[in-house]
Amino acid sequence: MKKLLFILLLTTFSFAQRKIESHQIINKEKIEGIINRIDSFPTKFIVPRTVDVWLPSNYSKDKKYSVLYMHDGQMLFDATSTWNKQEWMVDDVVSKLNSENKIEDIIVVAIWNIPNLRHMDLYPNKPYQLLSKEIQESIQTEVKKAKFPFDDKKINSDNYLQFIVTELKPYIDKNYSVYTDAEHTGIMGSSMGGLISMYAICEYPNIFGKASCLSTHWVGFRDFENNPIPESFFTYMEKNLPNPKNHKIYFDYGTETLDASYLKYEYRVDEVLQSKGYTSENYKSLKFEGENHSEASWQKRINIPIEFMFGKN
């Protein structure tokens, strides 16, 4: 989407005895829908942050919509305001899929990250707790060597999911014309957003019926020799993946830059999913040769997971 322009239309919602104010953002040059922005969504679980609710241009209260929750919300719609001048172009892709009658009607709820808290908000807590204290200490040694901002005492993903499930989703369900069941609710992200999306469908299978995890960051922070982190995720998944009869999961990866470090772990993803009864009907694990770890690469292929999750039968 080209640069977003603010329309001074303010809407105030009352939710759980709190007023949540949103304003519309519209691209006047080429409208690909409307964004209702909440600048600081009130929450008791995490640091308040911006939430964007994207609606198709023909949004109507007279019909119901499925909902896709996405992480790193500031990277999804407007390249002119992102740190690397790239975007997912979610509005354009969903609008195109709609115009081609390939997917159900959906809205997108985009949760912004707070850069210095992102890793702690999105790193799945329970897989990390499966590691022994000795292994956790060895990981922190590697973290210090890499000078990486990963403090395992501050992992906050359980609270992040609590925010989505108990505060954000009830607000969306109340204020938009949406289906509220798991069958019509998906969650999607890339890198750390891929990890938290996997974690979300495992922790809340009655809330999320679909998850898409692009360039999933199995290595945790950076890869190193005998890295125990990836296997902790796979062990967790073996115990917690939801019933394949009513859930869908999508994974993918490129082959360049950071994505190259995921190649050696993808066979384990396949092993785990297949051992839990997932088949081509409800699971995909795709390789994208030559693609790297960037919004530009994810933008090229997000139509695939979106259609996999919300495609018309």
Model regions: which residues?
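Bacterial Sec-dependent N-terminal signal peptides
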Residues: 1-23
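Non-catalytic cap/lid and distal C-terminal segments of serine-dependent acyl enzymes
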Residues: 18-313
